[in-house]
């Protein structure tokens, strides 16, 4: 099982690779990740939520997606993610966890 006690900069775009798909979230600080939980619950439609790093990663290695020209950074990214909390418009193709993170950054 992969340890998730590594520190990430606030506002980092985190990615976990699973068989056949990847899951994306934004690091919000204090070991928490904001993400669209659609894939996290086996394709069930769920809202944007805050979970721990270990809940987000399910024991998999966490990768950081780097942006050369990010429009927003740090706490502003987290604020943008929080502005969409409890949204429940997940769509595998049109509005997924990766789209949400890219929008926030």
What are these regions (language model features)?
Residues 1-105:
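Cysteine-nucleophile amide-bond enzymes
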């Amino acid at each position: 099982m992969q340890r998730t006690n590594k520190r990430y900069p606030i506002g980092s775009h985190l990615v976990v690779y699973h068989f056949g798909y990847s899951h994306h979230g934004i690091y919000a600080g204090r070991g928490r990740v904001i993400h669209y939980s659609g894939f996290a619950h086996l394709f069930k439609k769920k809202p944007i939520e805050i979970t721990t790093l270990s809940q987000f990663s399910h024991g998999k290695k966490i990768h950081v997606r780097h942006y050369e020209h990010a429009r927003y950074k740090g706490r502003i990214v987290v604020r943008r993610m929080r502005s969409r909390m409890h949204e429940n418009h997940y769509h595998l193709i049109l509005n997924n966890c990766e789209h949400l993170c890219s929008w926030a950054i």
